[in-house]
UniProtKB/Swiss-Prot annotation:
Inhibited by fructose 1,6-bisphosphate (FBP). This is Glycerol kinase. Its EC number is 2.7.1.30. Sn-glycerol 3-phosphate binds at T13, R83, E84, Y135, D244. Belongs to the FGGY kinase family. The keyword 4Fe-4S does not apply. The lineage of its organism: Bacteria, Pseudomonadati, Pseudomonadota, Betaproteobacteria, Burkholderiales. ATP binds at T13, T14, S15, T266, G309, Q313, G410. Key enzyme in the regulation of glycerol uptake and metabolism. Catalyzes the phosphorylation of glycerol to yield sn-glycerol 3-phosphate. GO terms for cellular component: cytosol. The gene is glpK. It comes from the Bacteria. Glycerol binds at R83, E84, Y135, D244, Q245. One of its GO terms (molecular function) is glycerol kinase activity. CDD domains: FGGY_EcGK_like (cd07786).
Length: 500
C-alpha cells in the first residue's frame, strides 16, 4: 500500500470539506466548499440535500486531483458529518421529498413539549440516552411525514428512506445501492436503543415512523461497500463513518475511560469517553455511543454549549469592538483580568448542564472603569467557564477524574483562553499538532478497517503535542472567579424567570 492515502470527507453545517491523510496522519491535501443556509421561517433551518451531495462529491474529487493523484491512490474513504440533520428521499427515484431539516431547526419544539407532557421523557432517555428535544432526528422525520403531501402513504408502502447525512452520502456514492448508517449517527436520532444497539420498535410506534424507512446500522469502522459513482473512476472502499463529535473524540485518541476532548467552535462540544458501559446522566448531559470497532463499543457523555466562538463574532459584528476574530486575544491580554466583569452569553438560552431555553445574554459587574478590553476578556472567560460547568457535570456523573483536557477547533488556537481554561480546571489543557481532529478521526476509522494502520496502538502513537497549558492560578483566585460566574448565571436565569 505504498503511496496510498486515506480520504476523509467532513460534511459540516456550513461547508463540505475533504482531506487526504498520509500514513503518518499528516494532511496532504484539503478542499472546501460552502453551501446555502435556507431559513424558510424564524427557527427553521434547512439545507438542499442535492447541494450537500454535489459540494461533497466536488471537494472529494478536488482534494485528490489537486495533488496530481487519482482514485487508485485512495486506499479508503472515511465519512464524518453534522449529526441529527434529517433527509428523507424516494427509494425509486433517489430524490429527496423535502429539504434536509438541520439539527439547529426548532420547528418541532411544540411537538416535543407535548411528548414531555405525556410523561415520556424518562422512557426516551432510558432507551436512547437523549432528552426529548427537536435537536434530534426523530421529530423531524415525523414532521416530514405529517407535512409533505403523500409522504406518509409512500412511507407505509416502503418507498421512502430516511438517513442522516452520512447515509445520504453513502447512498449516492454507491449509486442508490447501500442504505446504512453507523452506531454514532443512529444514537443521535432519538429512535435508537443504545443498550440493545437496535432501532427501538416502541419509540417508532410512539412517533408513527415505519421501520422500513430506517438504514441498517453498522460499526463505525468496517467496509460498508465501494464507490460506484463518476466521482472516481476506480472503486474505493467506504470504510469509516462517525458523527462529527465522535470522530473528533477518536481523532484526539481519547480511547480510554475518563479521557475528554473539547471542540471550541461556534459552540463548544465536550465529550468524555466512559468506556464500555453507558452512564446515565443526573446532570443534564447526553449519553451516547462514542464509536464501535469490531464488537468493541465505547460510550460517552456529551455536553453542548450553544455560544462559544460566536460570542467573539458578536463582539466583532454586533459591537464593532474588534475588526477580526483573531484580534480578541491581544485586546483581552492588554488587561490582567476582566476586573469583575462577567458576560453570560445566553443569546440562545443556556445549553448543558443548565438547559434553560429562556435565559438571555447578560453582562454583570460593569463600572465606569470598564473598557473594551475588559469586555473582550469577559467574553473569552465565558467560554472557559461554560466548559468548566460541563466538565464538572461529567466528573459528577461518571465518578471519573479528568486527567487532562484535549482541545481542538478554531478557538483552541487562542493561547489566553487555553491558559485560563487550564487554570479553572486545575489540569492541563493539551493542544495537538493536528487540530483537524474530526477529519482525522474519520480517516483513522476507515484506515483501521482496511489494515492501512495495523491497530489502535499504531494510530495512538501518531498523536503529537503542539502545546501543553499547565494551571498556574492560585486556588483561592480560581474559587473567587468561579463564585462570580455562578452568581452571574443565577442572575441570568432569574431575569428570564421573572418575565413569566
Amino acid at each position: 500500500m505504498q503511496d496510498q492515502y486515506i480520504l476523509a470527507l467532513d460534511q459540516g453545517t456550513t461547508s463540505s470539506r475533504a482531506m487526504l491523510f498520509d500514513r503518518q496522519g499528516n494532511i496532504v491535501s484539503i478542499a472546501q466548499k460552502e453551501f446555502e443556509q435556507i431559513y424558510p421561517q424564524p427557527g427553521w433551518v434547512e439545507h438542499d440535500p442535492q447541494e450537500i451531495w454535489s459540494t461533497q462529491a466536488g471537494v472529494a474529487a478536488e482534494a485528490v486531483t489537486r495533488t496530481g493523484l487519482n482514485g487508485t491512490s485512495i486506499a479508503a474513504i472515511g465519512i464524518t458529518n453534522q449529526r441529527e440533520t434529517t433527509i428523507v428521499w424516494d427509494r425509486e427515484t433517489g430524490q429527496p421529498v423535502y429539504n434536509a431539516i438541520v439539527w439547529q431547526d426548532r420547528r418541532t419544539a411544540d411537538f416535543c413539549d407535548s411528548l414531555k407532557k405525556q410523561g415520556l421523557e424518562a422512557k426516551v432517555r432510558a432507551k436512547t440516552g437523549l432528552p426529548i428535544d427537536s435537536y434530534f432526528s426523530a421529530t423531524k422525520i415525523r414532521w416530514i411525514l405529517d407535512n409533505v403531501p403523500g409522504a406518509r402513504d409512500k412511507a407505509r408502502q416502503g418507498k421512502l428512506a430516511f438517513g442522516t447525512v452520512d447515509s445520504w452520502l453513502v447512498w449516492n456514492f454507491t449509486k442508490h445501492e447501500l442504505h446504512v448508517t453507523d452506531v454514532t449517527n443512529a444514537s443521535r436520532t432519538m429512535l435508537f436503543n443504545i443498550h440493545t444497539r437496535q432501532w427501538d420498535d416502541e419509540l417508532l410506534e410512539l412517533l408513527d415512523i415505519p421501520r422500513s424507512m430506517l438504514p441498517e446500522v453498522k460499526a463505525s469502522s468496517e467496509i460498508y461497500g465501494h464507490t460506484k459513482t463518476t466521482v472516481f473512476a476506480s472503486k474505493i472502499p467506504l470504510a469509516g463513518i462517525a458523527g462529527d463529535q465522535h470522530a473528533a473524540l477518536f481523532g484526539q485518541m481519547c480511547t480510554t475511560s475518563g479521557m475528554v476532548k473539547n471542540t471550541y467552535g461556534t459552540g463548544c462540544f465536550l465529550m468524555m469517553n466512559t468506556g464500555d458501559k453507558p452512564i446515565e446522566s443526573k446532570n443534564n448531559l447526553v449519553t451516547t455511543i462514542a464509536w464501535q470497532i469490531g464488537d468493541d463499543v465505547q460510550y460517552a457523555l456529551e455536553g453542548s454549549i450553544f455560544i462559544a466562538g460566536a460570542v467573539v463574532q458578536w463582539l466583532r459584528d454586533g459591537l464593532g469592538i474588534i475588526k477580526t476574530a483573531a484580534e480578541i486575544e491581544a485586546l483581552a491580554a492588554s488587561v490582567p483580568h476582566s476586573d469583575g466583569v462577567y458576560l453570560v452569553p445566553a443569546f440562545a438560552g443556556l445549553g448543558a448542564p443548565h438547559w434553560n431555553a429562556r435565559a438571555r445574554g447578560s453582562l454583570f459587574g460593569v463600572t465606569r472603569g470598564t473598557r473594551d478590553a475588559h469586555l473582550a476578556r469577559a467574553a473569552l472567560d465565558a467560554i472557559a467557564y461554560q466548559s468548566l460547568d460541563v466538565l464538572a457535570a461529567m466528573e459528577a456523573d461518571s465518578g471519573l477524574s479528568i486527567g487532562e483536557l484535549r482541545v481542538d477547533g478554531g478557538a483552541s488556537a487562542n493561547n489566553l483562553l487555553m491558559q485560563f481554561q487550564a487554570d479553572l480546571l486545575g489540569v492541563d489543557a493539551v493542544r495537538p499538532q493536528i487540530t483537524e481532529t474530526t477529519a482525522l478521526g474519520a480517516a483513522y476509522l476507515a484506515g483501521l478497517a482496511i489494515g492501512y494502520w495495523k491497530n489502535l496502538d499504531e494510530v495512538r502513537s501518531q498523536w503529537q503535542l503542539d502545546r501543553r497549558f499547565a494551571p498556574s492560578m492560585p486556588k483561592q483566585q480560581v474559587e473567587r472567579c468561579m463564585a462570580g460566574w455562578q452568581r452571574a448565571v443565577r442572575a441570568a436565569k432569574a431575569w428570564a424567570d421573572d418575565a413569566q
